[in-house]
């Protein structure tokens, strides 16, 4: 007879490309290592652990004993190693070739380093797109986990989410596990007893139910106050002890065991989705606030509760709409990926250089710098700089991949580089890459120093965020953007003084026309009145090129006899 409840517990540990060594070290000390040591003391607790590629490489260099411990616990079948895309990209932003390559390369790394078989994967930010199923299956993935939000958006009821399902794409199938939002909030922010009560309610509803927890390992030691809660005060110890005491009716299972031993509930085709909070963060501030109000109101109204699961926000892809800087990084990565694929197909490039360029491209696709939610994300300059550094490195390696193919002259390429339906201009030589956007104020939006692997214009505009209302409200009034039932915590006083918004891009060659007596403070905080729309208007561009010289001329049409022009040589 099957157990009353099978409990699958999945932990996702990640630090992004470009994060500081001290952050890696502190996270290992406060969360990753204490959890493994706690598991050693509770052999009855079986979990699946995903360690992202950037973190695994750092651990192998700084704490190889941690990976050795993972390998031993995997060999003892107390834990299952979960694969993924190597450098933790959101797969929705990758072409299929890069999705498959990232997954296969990381599976090979994990199986070689940890000497274990990898059958499942963690999807970064649990961002799902229906077109992924075939790519994941082609990469050898047998199962993954997604939020119950995805399943509810497909029309499944709560009582259908106590089992795993299949999904399908292009004739290939994949097992998918629904992660309980209730358990995500209870562990570790409720009490251990609440988690057990939830499992008990599943057992009462249907014998043989499956419960799935899956969330960030940083919740157990890195997030504010969680090291004290989870380890010093013994929250996790209490949970594990309660689970071991409940072994007569709760069976801790590894995901691959469930896939092998338990028939799926059926096949479901899931819509594009992520976890609930992510679908809200991607919306503009006003829409975000409206979406949250609608969801909370519907959940609280018995007449509307049935439709509440269908109230969700937007597509993860639209972070590229919210933040043009994210789209600039994405477009840069796509340009590298396209060039790399073309050189592979030509067959005359150095395979070692292509391999190194692939690694650099994959590192430049690490997701954290491409969006913003509860944590810094795209607002962190060291993450943006790291992405550009890797993408510039990849381009440089591709330059060297063909014999005698180093860039010696200067060239201009005109095309729609950023997918906005308008042309941009890329001017390149050995030391520099310059990218112009005539239709967006004639700005220079990227300037790469190739030898330094650095984009001087990896800047970020100041723009409205939904939580700015909480910042302006101040301590004692503001609510947490993660859980509105909790007060917001302020790291410093006077943050409201820094809430400013830019009326134009923070780039180069932006033409501003202010009155002579303009207040410099008004210029700095973005409130100075401008005469004309030269900073944001559409310029006409002409490129004049010779063997040793490229001139880009921007003309701004006016009603007067002469146009406003700017020229870059």
How would you label these PLM feature ranges?
Residues 5-95, 101-102, 119-123, 142-148, ...:
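Short, well-structured secondary-structure segments
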Residues 556-561:
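Short, small-residue-biased leader/transition segments that mark boundaries at the very start
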Residues 2-33, 40-42, 160-174, 178-182, ...:
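Active-site and substrate-binding clefts of carbohydrate-active enzymes
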Residues 104-159, 219-239:
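Catalytic domains of cell-wall/extracellular-matrix polysaccharide-remodeling enzymes
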Residues 86-90, 149-156, 160, 176-190, ...:
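Positively charged, amphipathic and often flexible ligand-engagement surfaces
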Residues 25-29, 97, 101-104, 430-544:
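Acidic-aromatic substrate-binding/catalytic surfaces of carbohydrate-active enzymes
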Residues 32-39, 67-71, 100-110, 133, ...:
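Generic structural signal for well-ordered alpha-helices
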Residues 98-125, 172, 200-215:
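CE4/NodB-like, metal-dependent polysaccharide N-deacetylase domain
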């Amino acid at each position: 007879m099957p157990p009353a409840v099978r409990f699958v517990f999945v932990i996702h540990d990640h630090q992004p490309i470009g994060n500081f060594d001290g952050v890696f070290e502190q996270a290992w000390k406060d969360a990753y290592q204490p959890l493994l040591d706690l598991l050693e003391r509770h052999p009855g607790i079986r979990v699946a652990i995903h360690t992202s590629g950037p973190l695994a490489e750092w651990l192998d260099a700084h704490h190889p004993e941690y990976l050795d411990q993972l390998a031993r616990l995997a060999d003892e079948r107390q834990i299952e190693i979960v694969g993924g895309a190597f450098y933790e990209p959101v797969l929705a932003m990758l072409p299929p070739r890069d999705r498959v390559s990232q997954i296969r390369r990381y599976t090979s790394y994990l199986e070689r380093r940890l000497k274990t078989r990898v059958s499942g994967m963690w999807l970064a930010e649990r961002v799902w797109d229906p077109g992924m199923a075939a790519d994941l299956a082609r990469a050898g993935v047998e199962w993954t986990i997604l939020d119950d939000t995805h399943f509810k958006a497909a029309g499944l009821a709560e009582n259908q989410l106590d089992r795993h399902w299949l999904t399908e794409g292009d004739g290939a199938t994949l097992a998918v596990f629904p992660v309980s939002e209730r358990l995500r909030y209870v562990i570790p922010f409720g009490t251990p007893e609440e988690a057990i009560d939830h499992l008990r309610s599943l057992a009462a509803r249907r014998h043989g139910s499956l419960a799935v927890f899956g969330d960030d390992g940083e919740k157990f030691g890195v997030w504010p106050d969680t090291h004290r809660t989870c380890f010093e005060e013994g929250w996790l110890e209490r949970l594990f002890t309660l689970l071991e005491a409940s072994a007569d009716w709760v069976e801790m299972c590894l995901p691959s065991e469930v896939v092998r031993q338990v028939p799926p509930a059926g096949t479901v085709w899931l819509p594009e989705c992520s976890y609930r909070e992510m679908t809200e963060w991607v919306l503009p501030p006003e829409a975000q606030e409206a979406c949250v109000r609608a969801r909370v109101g519907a959940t609280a109204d018995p007449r509307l509760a049935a439709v509440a699961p269908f109230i969700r926000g937007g597509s993860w892809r639209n972070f590229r709409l919210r933040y043009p800087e994210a789209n600039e990084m994405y477009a840069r990565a796509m340009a590298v990926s396209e060039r790399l694929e073309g050189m592979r197909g030509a067959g005359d490039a150095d395979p070692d250089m292509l391999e190194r360029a692939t690694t650099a491209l994959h590192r430049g696709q690490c997701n954290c710098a491409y969006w913003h939610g509860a944590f810094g994300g795209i607002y962190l300059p060291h993450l943006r700089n790291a992405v550009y550094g890797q993408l510039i490195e990849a381009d440089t390696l591709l330059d060297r991949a063909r014999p005698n193919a180093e860039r010696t002259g200067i060239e201009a390429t005109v095309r729609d580089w950023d997918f906005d339906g308008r042309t941009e201009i890329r001017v390149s030589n050995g030391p520099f890459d310059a990218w112009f956007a005539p239709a967006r104020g004639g700005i220079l939006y990227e300037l790469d120093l190739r030898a330094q692997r650095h984009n001087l214009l990896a800047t970020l505009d100041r723009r409205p965020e939904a939580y700015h209302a909480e910042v302006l409200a101040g301590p004692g009034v503001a609510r947490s953007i993660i859980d509105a039932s909790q007060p917001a915590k302020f790291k410093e006083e006077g943050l409201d003084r820094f809430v400013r918004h830019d009326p134009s891009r923070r780039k180069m060659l932006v033409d501003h026309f202010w009155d002579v007596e303009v207040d410099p403070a008004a210029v700095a905080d973005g409130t100075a009145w401008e005469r004309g729309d030269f900073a944001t208007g559409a310029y006409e561009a002409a490129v004049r090129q010779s063997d040793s010289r490229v001139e880009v001329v921007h003309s701004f049409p006016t009603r007067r006899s002469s146009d406003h022009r700017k020229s870059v040589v």
